[in-house]
Amino acid sequence: MLRSCTAGLRSIWALRGRREGAPRLSMDLQPARRLFSTEKVIHKDWALPNPSWSKDLKLLFDQFMKKCEDGSWERLPSYKRRSTQESEDFKTYFLDPKLVEEERLSQAQLFTRGFEDGLGFEYVIFKNNDEKRTVCLFQGGPYLQGVPGLLHGGAMATMIDIALGSCTGGAVMTANLNINFKRPVPLCSVVVINSQLDKLEGRKLFLSCNVRSVDEKTLYSEATGLFIKLDPEKSST
Ligand SMILES: CCCCCCCCCCCCCC(=O)SCCNC(=O)CCNC(=O)[C@H](O)C(C)(C)COP(=O)(O)OP(=O)(O)OC[C@H]1O[C@@H](n2cnc3c(N)ncnc32)[C@H](O)[C@@H]1OP(=O)(O)O
């Protein structure tokens, strides 16, 4: 597996920055062009196939895209930055200007989307609104290694948090995340995270998920999460 990962890493390096339509940033670009390129990267939807996606990931993606045709499922787009509206919504809860300088905030990016193609978190989430559940297809790249050849548990926890969060809506925060890691996840493999909203109790959303291999034979993790809808009357800081 390590050997195949090394080969994967080599081909990933060969593909660096070649996500279809992705601008290449280099130091010799003129400032105006650099700014334009950066804008394109920020507004790009990253939950779409790129050359680093394995056959398994592409196949599952195509299957779920078919399910989207009758409107029962939808693919959730994913950006490096939250929309201006979403950011404004969250800002109302974090009013203290000393907390994060505005300038720093303008550089902020969703950290799962901060890696080059194939090296970090490659994922797409599909949502079934009627059934209050989502399916996240996730391929963890070589920069997410923990124990040699295996995905870091923190990387898995991050994806579980995002997958559970995708079953919620509006301004929520993770209050509790409980994960049972049952089997280690091979680096560069594809896993499927099935998440659902189990119960809504006032501002509390109780969610659960499982993480399985593509053939569904291996159960890697099970998790539950408590998310809290933020109270507009309270500042969280
Ligand atoms: C397109 C979209 C796709 C999705 C992708 C998204 C991408 C981004 C994804 C990024 C994802 C990033 C995600 C992240 O990284 S979120 C970052 C990690 N999370 C935090 O930093 C949260 C820190 N905590 C807080 O801010 C507050 O504690 C919150 C806001 C959570 C609640 O403070 P608030 O003052 O508002 O509420 P309350 O204290 O009155 O409590 C209310 C009720 O809740 C119950 N309670 C509270 N805590 C717990 C607990 N631990 N276990 C059990 N119960 C708990 C409490 O008993 C009470 O119950 P009841 O008495 O009413 O019965």
UniProtKB/Swiss-Prot annotation:
E.C. number(s) listed in UniProt: 3.1.2.2
Topology in the lipid bilayer: Peripheral membrane protein
One cellular component term from this protein's GO annotations in UniProt: ruffle membrane
Places the protein is found: Cell membrane; Cell projection, Ruffle membrane; Cytoplasm; Mitochondrion
Positions bearing Phosphoserine: S37
Any one GO molecular-function label of the UniProt entry: long-chain fatty acyl-CoA hydrolase activity
Presequence extent in this chain: 1-36
Keywords on record: Apoptosis, Cell membrane, Cell projection, Cytoplasm, Fatty acid metabolism, Hydrolase, Lipid metabolism, Membrane, Mitochondrion, Mitochondrion inner membrane, Phosphoprotein, Transit peptide
Post-translational modification: Phosphorylated.
Active site per UniProt: D161 (proton donor/acceptor)
Gene3D superfamilies: Hotdog Thioesterase
Residues that coordinate or bind substrate: N180, K182, R203, K204
Reaction catalyzed: hexadecanoyl-CoA + H2O = hexadecanoate + CoA + H(+); octanoyl-CoA + H2O = octanoate + CoA + H(+); decanoyl-CoA + H2O = decanoate + CoA + H(+); dodecanoyl-CoA + H2O = dodecanoate + CoA + H(+)
Residues recorded with modification N6-succinyllysine: K55, K66, K98, K204
Top-level lineage group: Eukaryota
GO biological process: fatty acid metabolic process; negative regulation of phosphatidylinositol 3-kinase/protein kinase B signal transduction; regulation of mitochondrial membrane permeability involved in apoptotic process
Family as reported in the entry's similarity comment: Belongs to the THEM4/THEM5 thioesterase family.
Subunit structure: Homodimer and homotetramer. Interacts with AKT1 in the cytosol.
PANTHER family, per database record: ACYL-COENZYME A THIOESTERASE THEM4
Function of the protein: Has acyl-CoA thioesterase activity towards medium and long-chain (C14 to C18) fatty acyl-CoA substrates, and probably plays a role in mitochondrial fatty acid metabolism. Plays a role in the apoptotic process, possibly via its regulation of AKT1 activity.
Protein name as annotated: Acyl-coenzyme A thioesterase THEM4
Source species: Bos taurus (Bovine)
